[in-house]
Amino acid sequence: MEIEYICRHTIGTAPRAAEELWVMLGDNNSWSRLDNWFYKCPEDDPRLLTQDYVLEHTPYVDVIARQHPGRFQTTTHSEKRIDFVYCTPALYDCVTRAEVVRDDYTEPVRDPKKLSNFWHPSDHRPIVVDFDLKKARKQ
């Protein structure tokens, strides 16, 4: 799995990573078990494997899931959350805001005049996370 390689060669190289300021984010094209209350897919569904690895083998915290427990936050034009922001507990303590931006501009709209898979402004919604790094310096 690509995510295993990525994690082992980045955060996996830092013995005290949970106490350091690490972040990993992106379009992972996979689902999180933390959202399975919404998806209701079988426990052995392969779409959960990538995020399972991150949650089980790294100190990373899923920022959106932690900030909005019990509230599904779709990040695409359909009801899926495949974009993730992870950070270590030390950095999570600095989070002041975390949200998937949903407004008239960020609402994905298919544009049939262009390519069949073209969405305006994007097929993904932006995720905003604000960190107050002054809090990290005090620790």
Residue ranges and their predicted role:
Residues 1-9, 24, 31:
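Active-site beta-loop-alpha substructure in enzyme catalytic cores
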Residues 12-23, 30-139:
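Metal-dependent phosphoester-hydrolase catalytic domains
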